[in-house]
Amino acid sequence: MKREEIKVSVLRVGGTNCDAETKRAFEELGVQAEILHANELVRRGNLLEYHVLVFPGGFSYGDYVRAGAIWAKWIMAKLGEELKAFVNENRFTLGICNGFQVLVEAGFLPGFDGVSPYPEAVLATNFPPGYNCRWIHLKHENRGKCAFTWKIPHGKVLRLPVAHSEGRFMFAKEKEKEFLKRLCDNDQLVFRYCDRNGEYAEGRFPTNPNGSFYDIAGICNPEGNIFGLMPHPERAFYWWQQPDWTRQKQMLQYGDGKLIFESIIEYLVEKF
Amino acid sequence: MSISLYIRRKTFPLFEVNVLGASDQQLLEISRELGVGLNLQEMNRVQEFFRRKGRNPTDVELQTIGQTWSEHCFHKTFKGVIKFDGEEIDSLFRTYIAKATNDLKPRWCFSIFEDNAGIIRFDKSYGVAVKVETHNHPSAVEPFGGAATGVGGVIRDVLGVWADPIACMDVLGFGPLNFDYEKLPPGVKHPKYVYMGVVAGIGSYGNNMGIPTVNGAIYFDESYVGNVVVYCGCVGLLPLKKFRRNAKPEDIIVLAGGRTGCDGIHGVTFASAVLTEKSEEVSRPAVQIANPIEEEKLKRAIIRIRDLELASAITDLGGGGLSSAVGETAKRFGCGAVVELDKVPLKYPGLAPWEIYVSESQERMLLAVPPENLQKVLEVFRSEDVEANAIGKYISDEVLKVYYQGEKVAEIEIPFLFEPPKVVRTAEYKSKVFEEPTFEEPKNLTDTLLQLLASPNIASKESVVRTYDHEVKGNTLLKPLQGESAGPNDAAVLKPLDDSWKGLAISCGMNPNYGKIDTYWMAASAIDEAIRNNVAVGGRRIALLDNFTWGSPEKPEVLSSLVRACKACYDFATAFKTPFISGKDSLYNESPLGTVTPTLLITALGIIPDVRLVVSMDVKEVGDLIYVVGRTYNELGGSEYYRLKGFVGNTVPKVRAKEALKIFKAITRAIDLGLVKACHDLSEGGLGVAAAEMAFAGGYGMELYLQKVPVENLNRNDFVLFSESNSRFLVEVSEKAKEEFEALLRGLAYSEIGKIAKTPSLCVYGLSGDVVVDASLNDLLACWKRTFSSEV
């Protein structure tokens, strides 16, 4: 498939607010990206025209109950069947921050046995509590399953910003061990919070900014075509978005966030 | 209510108010009972007007007049006459603020003092709109809601000139967080409660709307215990050719956004009154309820309508609700308006017509739409899930007609509505003399520096800043916090356009403590600080905003301090060639604990031609030279150092504009030539604090020699280190750029005062060559971070 043929839909509803910069990141890499109101997608009924579907960051519908829960219920009610078909056709879905919360609430992630009718995990209130906007480090854990990171070397440390108040990834206590094993066995673990040297945070704040179980920052489904993460790759795309660019002697062309967008595009280019 | 004064007119709640037959005393009673806040002179004008009409006003009419003539909406004090020092000042606004801009006549000003936000040119096609609001009164009564709606309101001000909001900034003032509960008068909330609520409210609105909060400050003062200070600012971007302001008769009035309810009734009269013990009970309904997601949707729809060029005018609904938005639009375009109140969608039934007309429910905008575009406009709103309704139209007669259930409930001529009697006030200046402190110079200043770093006005506000999303939209190029240690950058820089390297620098300046001595030099210092913060990162072509928080202008002494601050605004805006482009005043900040310390916030907006040259404040490389630029004077009055010692003092820092302007230009030039590796302005805590911040932000130590600092009339280490003289910078320059840099500064006060050291500590040698400060970066940083590490 040619790069310029790739079509990305960046979805939005009331309260979505990271759509423009997400679209910009895709466009910078030469693919077609379009911001689409979810109402419009329902009206058009053309989801399958797109290769990549993105749930961007924001506060969908105000997140007045658990973050992402309202949009998740909305999307399953209005587009559930189409979305399942989209996933089953091996198209690609990305959830960033609020989008990750939506994918978890909708049962797409971790999706151990396909789309779950109820959430199998949760992105709970941060610990320590409160909204937190800062740059953190992530270690790439995936061994090649995730289409959004397959180009990133295993073990590479990336630097991206987080900005959320509900990002603590958790399983139900009694299933923690079992589910973690499945995540690892299925190669669903994608990013874990670590320090700049790649040492895992082990839950320590602020290296792990939200108290996530096992320092989990991002996971994919068993097939590797649905990926969600709390940090914002679209805010770490250009060199000048990095917090310490004024200290760099040699300007890098891009930030680490680009690796994620590039991976999925190259996946499509090379494998389709 | 006294029956004889009010006659119920209809089956719905509409009252005729017996103004014609009322005595002066009864007029005041009416004003008080209806909560319209009009004084006798104004009530007499109303009486005279309705006598000519030969009928009594309805409550809708009286309320409309009350809202329009309120201090909040009409700025009576700034537009009135002030007798001061033998002269008569006809309008502070025209005489000082607007005059500075008119004298300078910058070509890059696009629309100034015309709408709710000022617009300047950013480049050939784009303009930048900016506005800073005060939301002190609501935040005192309900901190979370007051602050959140303050942010919501200022974002709508920017939307109200067709600009897409791209950044917010917030400057806050609180009482000391450890204020004694025993001393708290009834009705005044504890500073800590106010602090937590206000910070959460601001974060919640900005984050939910997806607008980065990029700049701000938090200041503590005893007088803020009873009068919290909440300044909310917003910057927006608009393609200038899409700017529409040409409403005409027959255009439809479209009300869009949230529904109208009982929240925010009489917000403006409340904001123009003194806070009392009863404010909670009486004024709680005056605070609106925030729903940022509604505004987010509204924003999307409005930007689409702008781009499709479907509407002829727009304004936001803020203070005074519909009554002021409709009236002001009609006035602006020289027409009248017909409004049908039953077309206004309500949150719940049961509102009286006057309540619908003056309610300040949030997240609402008012558009003027040519009839042929109405359906398209409504369709855009519908597609964004935003409610919108045609509620009336503009007409050629300059009269306002309001209907409810087919009955006319108000008819007032527009010119009358905008000609309230001119307020005449008297100002009287009494210069203040504080004890000039005499204390011995401490031998070792390490502890003093550590204490200063931990003092509330200097200590790190990281725990607050991180609760605001400063990265959303992905265009924040220089962030509020710099480096791993989160050092305080002087200004935020945005890169608003994808295909351009042009940047926007946003900074602020505020020095309430100097105002205790003299508001003239306080204003001058705030202007200098805002500008030098902007210059420090590479900003130029600077525009200013003024925001006043003052006490009751009816007190001659308070008023004189306002006049003096305004004079300084004129003097220094013209001297620095930095026009005012917008502003706002909040007066009557009085509580049972007394008058607020006069607090002038100056916001500066600069342009950076190429953001790749932007400079941050953290030191970069061992061996580089450290320069101080600007002279240090014996000016410690109002300084943080004196405060630490328990004094105010009299020697308030002055601004020497001619010298300052040369320094600013030289710094700008040096940045453009790439000679500056780090730059930090010297403000609270002076040289000592600035050096410490630069050092721990960069992770390298410094060795400095006070002997080399250019001073005048100073022979004490502590004064050289902590004086807060204006127009000074600390600059890092590499050895090889030394000559070129010094050539640029020739003739100015500057000196190479030391080096960046490998040892991670700040070492300062005193005037006689001995070590006066020797502190590890870890200790400096720990003290700076400790104060607010767990407040939020």
List PLM regions with ranges.
Chain B
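Glycine/proline-enriched, intrinsically flexible loops and inter-domain linkers
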Residues: 2-792
